[in-house]
């Protein structure tokens, strides 16, 4: 059902990759985000055509994948239109920008053709400004990466975020407002980032 609806599969190890394959997931619909090096899982992910999601050099695969998303450490508090995003604590996940740039250059030299940036805050944020604020930080980081190394980002992974409200006194985020904010942001992207692919996994936590 989920595959038919256009969803993807986020896999952490070989067992989850095999399950995704059995359900018919393949290609960019599979994201492989390893927690530790695993040669067998890396090979299976490569055979599936998965996008590798890497949060540091400690999980760098033995051979550069066709496509990789590098996770950026949050660059200060999330803000949108000058206001702080409520319910989104500062996260230490991901890489500092300098380390990310080095890893991007290494992957590119090794043959990675499609490069992405992502942010994984792992929080059930109920503010519709969450994804637009993450998007803004990734756009800024992508611009600096291109300026420093000439590499162009093709994917933005906005990570997890929205949960489902089960309390009438705590309404969930306005998804239409979030979508409209993201649409407006994509309309102002620099030429090099036009057509960037967006992915996100709301509710996965």
Identify the function of each model-found stretch.
Residues 1-155, 190:
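Active-site-proximal beta-alpha core segment in soluble small-molecule metabolic enzymes
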């Amino acid at each position: 059902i989920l595959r038919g609806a256009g969803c993807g599969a986020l896999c952490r190890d070989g067992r989850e990759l095999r399950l995704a394959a059995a359900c018919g997931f393949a290609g960019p619909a599979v994201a492989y985000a390893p927690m530790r090096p695993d040669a067998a899982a890396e090979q299976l992910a490569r055979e599936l055509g998965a996008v590798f999601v890497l949060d540091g050099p400690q999980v760098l695969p033995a051979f550069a994948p066709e496509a990789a998303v590098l996770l950026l450490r949050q660059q200060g508090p999330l803000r949108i239109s000058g206001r702080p995003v409520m319910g989104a604590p500062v996260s230490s996940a991901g890489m500092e920008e300098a380390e990310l740039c080095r890893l991007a250059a290494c992957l590119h030299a090794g043959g990675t053709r499609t490069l992405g940036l992502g942010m994984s805050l792992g929080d059930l944020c109920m503010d519709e400004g969450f994804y637009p604020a993450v998007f803004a930080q990734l756009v800024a980081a992508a611009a600096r990466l291109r300026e420093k190394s000439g590499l162009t980002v093709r994917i933005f992974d906005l990570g997890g975020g929205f949960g489902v409200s089960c309390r009438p006194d705590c309404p969930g985020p306005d998804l239409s407002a979030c979508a409209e904010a993201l649409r407006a942001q994509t309309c102002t992207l620099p030429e090099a980032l036009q057509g960037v692919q967006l992915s996100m996994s709301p509710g996965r936590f």
